[in-house]
């Protein structure tokens, strides 16, 4: 019996492994919440994570940047399933119905810029999401500027948008906390 259970679990884990995983349930106000999505060149299986399959490594890296961007965070807050306080539960239909950056529509130059950014930031230590927003953490700003640039925003529009979004989202998350 034990061997069949192990075999069954191996099959389950094998089916769920992916190089991109997205948090299914998280507390945006928690000090430990630093990212919402994670890339691994070796397929992984995360507890309470959505496994996102079917993408090559480059596209998965671009999606990881997107899922961790402030635009995606805004989208999550607007369409969230609130559980308690700043806890958010992300359902599969929310991922499927959300707006996403499409790597297939990017130019080679845009892809290169995003992949270069990913490589530069992949070992960078990040504070919590709330601290990133409140303190305009430089790496979050770089991610957001890169995402907004490939979406067609110019520098002035980007700065105006981020000047509005960072304090607004900080306030929203802090209010959810109470």
Region spans (language model):
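Non-catalytic DNA-recognition/assembly elements of restriction-modification systems
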Residues: 104-178
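Polybasic, glycine- and aromatic-enriched phosphate-binding surface used to engage nucleic acids
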Residues: 1-116
